[in-house]
């Protein structure tokens, strides 16, 4: 009975098509494993970042090397899992992002991809003088630089986009302005990497946060 109802629902959904696409399901996705440091090619890492101000300030080769060092330092503490990607104009995207304990996210922006709404699923982040815990949201207008630090249990976020970016703009723009600030990110990454434990399932960071808060025995 329920199987027939599901088939009927799928058939019926074909009548309703948005300019962004048709009915779509991505069921029970697994978290993409983090990249390990041994796989990082330091000399190539800078290719993924627009970084003209740093290159102008320090020289191209020096800037590329520093970016590579930063990427190698932080890479095992984060992972991105696509949940929905619509490639049509103004298509929506939904991405799950995890950062490990006390992960120092670098200042950056995504001018190519449009406005972005973030939802904290589990754990917490420190943004400026605010602590954003599960259920919190923040909206980043297209091209605005931002950074934050993950809390002591790490953090999981959902990243919502609905198009509207600048086609020829960089997908990832590094907005750190000095090697000193990047060195702090590098040092912070190596200082905390022993506590970077990627969750097995989306939302599992909530258990680590509850344990850290002393609430686990009450759950």
Where are these predicted regions, by residue range?
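A short, N-terminal "cap"/entry segment at the start of jelly-roll beta-barrel domains
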Residues: 2-91, 187-188, 193-219
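Glycine-centered positions in the ABC transporter ATPase nucleotide-binding domain
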Residues: 122-123
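Structured binding elements
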Residues: 118
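Conserved short histidine dyad/triad with adjacent acidic residue
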Residues: 64-66, 72-111, 126, 131, ...
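Alpha/beta-hydrolase fold active-site loops
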Residues: 115
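Ligand-binding loop in jelly-roll beta-barrel domains
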Residues: 90, 131-134, 142-172
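Glycosyltransferase-associated regions of secretory-pathway enzymes
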Residues: 2-3, 171, 178-181
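Surface-exposed beta-loop interaction hotspot
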Residues: 175-192
């Amino acid at each position: 009975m329920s199987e027939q109802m599901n088939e009927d629902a799928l058939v019926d959904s074909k009548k309703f098509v948005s300019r962004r696409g048709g009915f779509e399901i991505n069921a029970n996705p697994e978290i993409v494993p983090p990249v390990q440091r041994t796989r990082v090619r330091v000399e190539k890492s800078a290719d993924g970042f627009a970084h003209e101000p740093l290159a102008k300030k320090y020289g191209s080769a020096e800037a590329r090397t520093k970016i590579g060092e930063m990427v190698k330092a932080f890479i095992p503490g984060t992972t991105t899992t696509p949940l929905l990607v619509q490639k049509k104009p103004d298509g929506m995207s939904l991405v799950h992002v995890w950062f490990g304990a006390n992960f120092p996210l670098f200042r950056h922006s995504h001018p190519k991809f449009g406005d972005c709404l973030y939802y904290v699923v589990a754990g917490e982040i420190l943004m400026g003088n605010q602590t954003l815990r599960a259920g919190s949201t923040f909206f980043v207008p297209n091209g605005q630089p931002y950074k934050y630090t993950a809390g002591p249990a790490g953090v999981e976020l959902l990243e919502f986009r609905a198009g509207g970016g600048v086609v020829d703009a960089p997908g990832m723009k590094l907005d750190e302005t000095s090697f000193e600030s990047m060195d702090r990110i590098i040092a912070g990454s190596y200082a905390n990497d022993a506590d970077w434990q990627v969750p097995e399932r989306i939302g599992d960071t909530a258990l680590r946060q509850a344990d850290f808060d002393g609430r686990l025995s009450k759950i």
